């Protein structure tokens, strides 16, 4: 039964039938084409014939008579035991709609797809003979076996020719292609179906497919009398299924996101390897999808067809070497969105039955699109305000932004899952074009696809535009038009393009135009592949719009989020501790151990009277020691759970600082031990070659193509470079400071023994366990500890300065990054006292001059990495102390002198 093309919805209990003065359910002859217009944002409403007209009077009489007969026959059903809420059964509603629509078509002389040839011919003959029988006795025969599902050409007024094979298939099936709105009928099993219950498992609510070896049972079931309407109707539940798709959001926390194993299931089916249950539980414990193959599934005994379907779907988007061949295959089987007539191709070794069996094996609930409302929920404003990791990271990153997580292994898996989903959608559209009666509402991916498109749009556009969105993106109507061949996707894409350009940033306009052109190309070239590409672009644009909105909200709300960042984190962890969801015992034991070690080592100024500032200093030292490469820690304390990734990156920066200082120490040793230089020459060489220049040149040598620093593998290159720099600066000084003469091409004069010594020394001292490395690392840690303690100004009651919250502001140039902590910053925002970085007393050389003395051997203040590490540690340690400092002091008890508090 064709669903009436009106958006008024099905007849409700309070309004069982339209009145004679307002027959809005019957379309007029002038609007029989029912075209979508890209310039209109809403669908056209039906034109109602006047009661005074002959057609209108006949329709009114027919409707009244039909309703009267239905009421007399008592063939009605009530809801909630109320006798007033009357809904006609399927047979009555079928007869009522068919009579009304055929009478209008008879008067207009136009044959619509909902009429049969016999009915239209009889109606025309009766009308021309002037037979004005009573409307109550009017019986228009409707031959449901010869229902036409051809494409109607709106320009010529004729139906387009269709394949005889398709006509024979549709004539044999004798079923509708889509169920009525808000209800569905089990096509293959017309037995009574009770309403689904929320307590039943999903498999129980899904229609059971009959075995392929018993076609006589299906024919016998189709010949049964209609009976009561409740035996044929099943009301859909309005409850939305939860989406188990992978979230596509990544922020600076580098938080691990869970993913489902649908891709691995497909691979296991393809390779015929069962998934080990232990691994499945361990890796995919959050997955709630049912497996593809069930014990009661008719395909479980012979999965060959399903494997071939999966292989074909993956092959379409697989190797780049077969892209040209795949395009030819897809184009040969493509569809025209105006004609919806798919051509069969001899290139396919996959039969239509294999495709149908693959669709029937779809698990329930049906998978959602890769970009769905559940995955985008994380970036809603309410979720942003409740996200503790984001509230923590925003302190360190002023330009914190959401972006799609397509990096690394998770990104590759996400792309593979998306390709599988869209290939399945492409397969469904192809099958439904050949066999529309195969469509099942609860097993089609098209239903959640259109629902997700509408739901995501409703979260983006203003509330006043919601009725328009619901009207245009009517899922059931769009699917019905898609199955009948009347859905013009180019018009729908044009409407979406106008809507996107109106609400998204202008920089997204080229992307929107690309999406619209994809649909136009699909219609022009009859390409199903381009149609799927256009649908993918639609969802990608929706995701980008949601991300833009979320990033704008974060940027606007950042000052407010920073103002109560400490209080929010305090409340968050106190709530977890009170509910016993977080156990701090191990963390408290860790701090107590560090406290005892510092007291035993004599690192406390007055062990007999330890104050709260002393405890704060121990906290600084304990956290900094977690960054040591000599004593690598595998786990961090629970209070530092939000800073795991940040601490790992800080440890890499610490190693880079120490290795640069090792190279600087080697450079000064080579200069000091060179007998060919006098004192003035040595001072000139050391003064000219600054630590910053040394760092830039060495980093360019040791960095590989992936951006990783390889110190131990490039010791020979570093040794040659340092010897070459010393030789060049020596000749430059001898030539009265002329760089041009020193850099003239000359024969190499490097000493091989010096290069060998430098290489051997670097290979040993760049190892974290070497003594020189340990001395330099401790020196860096001591400088960081003193700088943080002096700036914090910890009071006697343990309060520290709260300026760390606003340390990273864009107006100071302190722009953070989500992937690296080594960023260029403004040195004026964090000023380090020169006394903290004074030259080492154990230096092998004693340079003269104020500039050389202020730089010295351990002049780490010239390194941007040191400034970056200092800022991050200053904010991290003070935030940690503000939240967990009271717990540490309470745990120490009488060990701390609390006088004056």
Curated annotation (Swiss-Prot):
One of its GO terms (biological process) is cAMP/PKA signal transduction. Residues 1-87, 106-139, 162-231 are annotated as: Disordered. One of its GO terms (cellular component) is nucleus. It is found in: Nucleus. Residues 74-87, 106-115, 220-231 have a biased composition (Polar residues). It comes from the Eukaryota. Residues 10-51, 116-138 have a biased composition (Low complexity). The keyword Nucleus applies. Belongs to the TCP11 family. This is Protein SOK1.
């Amino acid at each position: 039964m064709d669903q009436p093309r009106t958006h008024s919805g099905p007849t409700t209990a309070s309004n069982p039938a339209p009145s004679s003065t307002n027959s809005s359910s019957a379309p007029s002859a002038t609007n029989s084409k029912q075209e979508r217009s890209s310039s209109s944002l809403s669908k056209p409403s039906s034109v109602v014939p006047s009661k005074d007209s002959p057609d209108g009077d006949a329709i009114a009489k027919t409707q009244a008579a039909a309703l009267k007969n239905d009421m007399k026959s008592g063939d009605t059903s009530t809801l909630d035991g109320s006798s007033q809420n009357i809904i006609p059964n399927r047979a009555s509603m079928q007869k009522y709609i068919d009579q009304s629509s055929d009478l209008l078509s008879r008067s207009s002389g136009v044959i619509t797809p909902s009429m049969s040839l016999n009915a239209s011919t009889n109606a025309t003959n009766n009308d021309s003979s002037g037979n004005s029988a009573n409307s109550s006795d009017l019986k228009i025969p409707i031959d449901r076996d010869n229902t036409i599902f051809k494409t109607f050409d709106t320009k010529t007024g004729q139906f387009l020719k269709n394949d005889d094979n398709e006509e024979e298939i549709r004539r044999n099936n004798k079923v509708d292609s889509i169920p009525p709105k808000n209800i569905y009928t089990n096509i293959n099993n017309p037995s009574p179906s009770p309403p689904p219950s929320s307590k039943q498992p999903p498999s129980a609510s899904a229609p059971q497919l009959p075995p392929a070896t018993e076609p006589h049972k299906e024919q016998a079931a189709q010949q049964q009398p209609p009976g009561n309407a409740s035996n044929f109707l099943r009301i859909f539940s309005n409850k939305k299924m939860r989406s188990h798709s992978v979230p596509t959001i990544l922020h600076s926390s580098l938080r691990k996101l869970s993913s489902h194993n649908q891709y691995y299931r497909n691979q296991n089916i393809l390779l015929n390897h069962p998934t080990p249950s232990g691994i499945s539980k361990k890796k995919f414990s959050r997955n709630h999808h049912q497996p593809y193959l069930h014990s009661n599934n008719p395909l479980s005994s012979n999965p060959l067809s399903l494997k071939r379907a999966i292989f074909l779907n993956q092959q379409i988007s697989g190797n780049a070497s077969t892209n040209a061949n795949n395009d030819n295959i897809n184009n040969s089987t493509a569809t025209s969105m105006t004609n919806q007539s798919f051509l069969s191709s001899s290139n396919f070794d996959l039969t239509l039955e294999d495709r149908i069996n693959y669709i029937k094996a779809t698990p329930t609930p049906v998978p959602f699109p890769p970009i769905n409302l559940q995955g985008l929920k994380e970036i809603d404003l309410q979720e942003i305000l409740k996200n503790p990791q984001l509230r923590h990271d925003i302190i360190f990153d002023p330009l914190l932004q959401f972006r799609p997580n397509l990096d690394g292994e998770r990104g590759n898996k996400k792309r593979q899952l998306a390709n599988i989903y869209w290939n399945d959608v492409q397969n469904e559209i192809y099958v439904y074009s050949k066999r529309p009666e195969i469509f099942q509402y609860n097993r089609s991916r098209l239903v959640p696809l259109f629902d997700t498109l509408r739901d995501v749009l409703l979260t983006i556009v203003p509330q006043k535009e919601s009725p328009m969105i619901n009207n245009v993106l009517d899922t059931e109507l769009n699917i019905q038009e898609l199955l009948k061949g009347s859905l013009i996707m180019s018009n729908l894409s044009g409407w979406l393009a106008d809507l996107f350009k109106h609400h998204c940033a202008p920089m997204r306009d080229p992307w929107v135009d690309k999406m619209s052109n994809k649909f136009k190309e699909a219609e022009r070239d009859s390409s199903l592949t381009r149609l799927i590409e256009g649908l993918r672009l639609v969802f990608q644009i929706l995701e980008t719009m949601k991300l833009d909105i979320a990033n704008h909200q974060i940027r606007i709300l950042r000052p407010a989020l920073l103002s109560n960042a400490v209080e929010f984190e305090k409340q968050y962890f106190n709530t977890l501790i009170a509910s016993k969801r977080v156990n701090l015992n191990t963390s408290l034991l860790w701090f107590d151990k560090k406290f005892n070690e510092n007291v035993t080592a004599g690192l406390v100024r007055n062990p007999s009277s330890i104050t709260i500032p002393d405890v704060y200093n121990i906290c600084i030292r304990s956290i900094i020691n977690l960054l040591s490469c000599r004593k690598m820690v595998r786990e961090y304390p629970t209070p530092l759970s939000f800073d795991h990734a940040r601490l790992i990156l800080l440890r890499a920066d610490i190693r880079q600082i120490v290795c640069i200082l090792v190279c600087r120490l080697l450079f000064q040793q080579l200069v000091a031990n060179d007998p060919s230089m006098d004192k003035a020459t040595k001072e000139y060489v050391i003064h000219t070659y600054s630590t910053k220049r040394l760092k830039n040149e060495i980093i360019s040598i040791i960095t590989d193509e992936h951006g990783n620093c390889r110190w131990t593998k490039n010791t020979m290159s570093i040794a040659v470079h340092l010897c070459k720099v010393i030789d060049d600066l020596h000749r430059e000084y001898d030539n009265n400071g002329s760089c041009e003469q020193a850099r003239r091409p000359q024969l190499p004069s490097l000493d091989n023994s010096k290069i060998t010594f430098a290489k051997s020394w670097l290979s040993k001292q760049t190892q974290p366990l070497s003594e020189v490395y340990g001395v330099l690392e401790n020196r860096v840690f001591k400088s960081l500890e003193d700088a943080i303690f002096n700036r914090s100004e910890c009071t006697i009651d343990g309060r520290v300065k709260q300026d760390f919250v606003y340390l990273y502001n864009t107006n100071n140039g302190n722009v953070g990054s989500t992937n690296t902590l080594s960023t260029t910053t403004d040195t004026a925002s964090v000023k380090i006292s020169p006394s903290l970085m004074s030259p080492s007393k154990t230096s092998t050389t004693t340079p003269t001059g104020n500039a050389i003395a202020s730089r010295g051997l351990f002049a780490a203040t010239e390194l941007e990495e040191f400034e970056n590490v200092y800022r991050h540690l200053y904010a991290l340690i003070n935030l940690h102390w503000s939240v967990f400092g009271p717990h540490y002091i309470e745990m120490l008890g009488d060990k701390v002198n609390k006088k004056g508090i």
